[in-house]
Amino acid sequence: MKFKDLRDFVQQLEQRGELKRIQMPISPVLEMTEICDRTLRAKGPALLFEKPVGFDIPVLGNLFGTPERVAMGMGAEAVSELREIGKLLAFLKEPEPPKGLKDAWSKLPIFRKVIAMAPKVVKDAPCQEVVIEGDDVDLGMLPVQTCWPGDVAPLITWGLTVTKGPNKERQNLGIYRQQVIGRNKIIMRWLSHRGGALDFRDWCVKHPGEPYPVAVALGADPATILGAVTPVPDSLSEYAFAGLLRGSRTELIKCRGSNLQVPASAEIVLEGVIHPGEMADEGPYGDHTGYYNEVDSFPVLTVERITHRIKPIYHSTYTGRPPDEPAILGVALNEVFVPILQKQFPEIVDFYLPPEGCSYRMAVVTIKKQYPGHAKRVMLGVWSFLRQFMYTKFVIVTDDDINARDWNDVIWAITTRMDPKRDTVMIDNTPIDYLDFASPVSGLGSKMGLDATNKWPGETSREWGRAIVKDEATTRRVDEIWTQLGID
């Protein structure tokens, strides 16, 4: 099923019983977080708070609170179908030369479809039905959540940030949290390696001292939102990928104050500039680790204009100790990652990011082991192949007789197939999430690889253990008489 905008998605979810309208007045200060957290843990519906206390704009929460709703947002009917999206991305990331004329013809429709999904720029758009400029700009009109008791200020969480580097043809989309610090000021918390920060850095080099235009779209259609958090190849724009998911070209409109292009169907758009050198301390905030992060300095965005639809919806979320929405997104996008990794490493059978590992900090990989040292090659490949795994601290590699998604299996493999000294790989001074306060230096720390595979000659000189396997005939015999035994 495809959705033209956020409202269409909300309507379809409601028809399926996947959205609940909350008509009781609820405060965006702490109360919405508590309600969304309980609902998410119960695998409950998306929530539309129609009467946020002190505001006229309804708040949409827990939108991607189940893997099934993430799959729906990406145009799939089931989570299992996300593997097909992963296969498409794997092909587009590293397309293989055609093996012959027939193979070339078979691949041609894919490239045609990608080309046909180039974004479409329109002259009029719902996101500009209402325009607020200059002294009338007041971010206080938005029901921005204060999620946790120790949060320093309201925090915009689902802002789709649009930037463009001075040396690039294509725009960058990224989701960065933004602390509200005034009527027209927010802090842009983007890490140094992220696309928005790189674009801004290039701008400062090429246009020193000049204000840098930035736009933040709130409440875009689900395909565009999810396209911004998916490992899209550098050769494909997030807007084009969203078009592939949606089955129709992404409609964009030029901002009223810059040449940046934003989703035409977005509910709310913030337009503004970053003045080089204007920085502010951000935080502390409760984040996806379950802890409050330390205070750090980031650029300030001065909002010069707010445009929005008539009767807009404010899309929001919270981050906290898993499970939270980022963890659920990780579970769903895990299925996209598997084919991409398998394209590079065909020996990979499964790949799993346990949600309790804060979405990406731990990975479990099962492989068809083919030679001594194979597990170490795979763990190094995981760390280096996709930028999404740059911050993965622990990689566990097991044989394919282990279920990567069953901790009973994984722990058994670790405790029976590993020698801590021989089978542990430690790498120091590597990039680490700035939110990871356990690292000795902010943004720099170590990684651990655990080789929990059966050891081959060359890896051990001892006779290796032989796993116990039940006798099949006995199992069948007991299956036949089980009900007669009266044990259950």
UniProtKB/Swiss-Prot annotation:
Q: How does it sit in the membrane?
A: Peripheral membrane protein
Where is this chain's protein located in or outside the cell? Answer: Cell membrane
Active site feature: 287 (proton donor)
- Protein name, entry field: 3-octaprenyl-4-hydroxybenzoate carboxy-lyase
Q: Where does the UniProt annotation place the signal sequence?
A: none
For this UniProt record, the keywords arranged alphabetically read as follows: Cell membrane, Decarboxylase, Flavoprotein, FMN, Lyase, Manganese, Membrane, Metal-binding, Ubiquinone biosynthesis
Where are its TM segments located? none
Predominant location: membrane
Q: In which pathway does it act?
A: Cofactor biosynthesis; ubiquinone biosynthesis
Listed cofactors: prenylated FMN; Mn(2+)
